[in-house]
Amino acid sequence: MSQRTESYLVGLVGDGVTPSLTPPMHEREGDVQGLRYLYRPIDLLELGLAGDSVGEVLRSARTLGFNGLNITHPCKQLVLQHLDEVSPDARRLGAVNTVVIRDGRFIGHNTDFSGFAAALASGLPGARLDRVVQLGAGGAGSAVAYALLSAGAKTLDLVDMDAERAAARAEELSGFFPDSTVTARTTADLPQLMPLADGLVHCTPVGMAAHPGVPLDLELLESRHWVADIVYRPIDTELVQGARAKGCDVLDGGRMAVGQAADAFRIFTGLDADPERMRSHFLELVAAEEVAA
């Protein structure tokens, strides 16, 4: 008697998601685990849809038998009003990037924060968290800050070009983590902050292929610092290269991308992904992109 192979249909909803590396990462892990796993980008720009159409996309996915969707810009906040249930951490963050469709209900999660937490634990085990400087307090930065504080960061200095945004984020996070100190800072404060810091986390677009450069003066880095970047295209950003040259322990952005994907895979399937196997495949995909370019 033949056994039926478990099958999954999932998608990625957002603007400009067609080139994303997330679908092939998921599909390869599904193949290795003996699943029929199909992951499709649902590019709102290509479809001529606005971000506020995400509710319609969710309902269509349910009708078509999707098991779940990953959600990215510009829909992570917009999707909240269409969900039946939201995990406590996603509710606190006010953003959802993973929706599982179960028994006709939409259940939201946030694997941005859990993906970074997993990356930090695996890529920088034992990193000191007495004081951390974080560059960028936007959407991704909020999730990373939440992960750092959840991991035990005692003092977190949020540095952002938008002082009001940094202040609002610091106040919000202080409410969630009353035993930690969260401060809003500006780039002008970095020369005073870095000598006091154990580590630096970078959460701005600087370093991406379209935004080359470094987000701070590399002379502020010391070999005792650890440095984490969430940019992964390219994987070796100028910050990562500069920090490595200074002798710092370094966490590249690919670790968070893989952590996000592994957590979403588990949410969709109920099966644990192998993060190191997924990272190996991720690095293959990035290398192939760089060769093609």
From Swiss-Prot:
Q: What are the protein's GO molecular function terms? A: NADP binding; shikimate 3-dehydrogenase (NADP+) activity
Q: Which pathway does this chain act in?
A: Metabolic intermediate biosynthesis; chorismate biosynthesis; chorismate from D-erythrose 4-phosphate and phosphoenolpyruvate: step 4/7
Enumerate the active-site residues. Answer: 76 (proton acceptor)
Q: What is its EC number?
A: 1.1.1.25
Q: Which UniProt keywords apply?
A: Amino-acid biosynthesis, Aromatic amino acid biosynthesis, NADP, Oxidoreductase
Reaction(s) catalysed by this chain, per the record, are:
shikimate + NADP(+) = 3-dehydroshikimate + NADPH + H(+)
Give yes or no: UniProt keyword Amino-acid biosynthesis.
yes
Q: Some GO term, biological process aspect, for this entry: which one?
A: amino acid biosynthetic process
The UniProt record gives the binding positions of NADP(+) as 136-140, 230, 253
Residues annotated as binding shikimate are 20-22, 72, 97, 112, 232
**Top-level class of the enzyme under EC nomenclature:** oxidoreductase
Domain of life, source organism: Bacteria
A Pfam family this chain is assigned to: Shikimate_dh_N
GO cellular component labels: cytosol
| Key word GTP-binding present | no
Q: Which family does it belong to?
A: Belongs to the shikimate dehydrogenase family.
User: What is the role of this chain?
Assistant: Involved in the biosynthesis of the chorismate, which leads to the biosynthesis of aromatic amino acids. Catalyzes the reversible NADPH linked reduction of 3-dehydroshikimate (DHSA) to yield shikimate (SA).
Assembly, per entry: Homodimer.
| Protein name, as recorded | Shikimate dehydrogenase (NADP(+))
In its UniProt entry, the species of origin is given as Pseudarthrobacter chlorophenolicus (strain ATCC 700700 / DSM 12829 / CIP 107037 / JCM 12360 / KCTC 9906 / NCIMB 13794 / A6) (Arthrobacter chlorophenolicus)
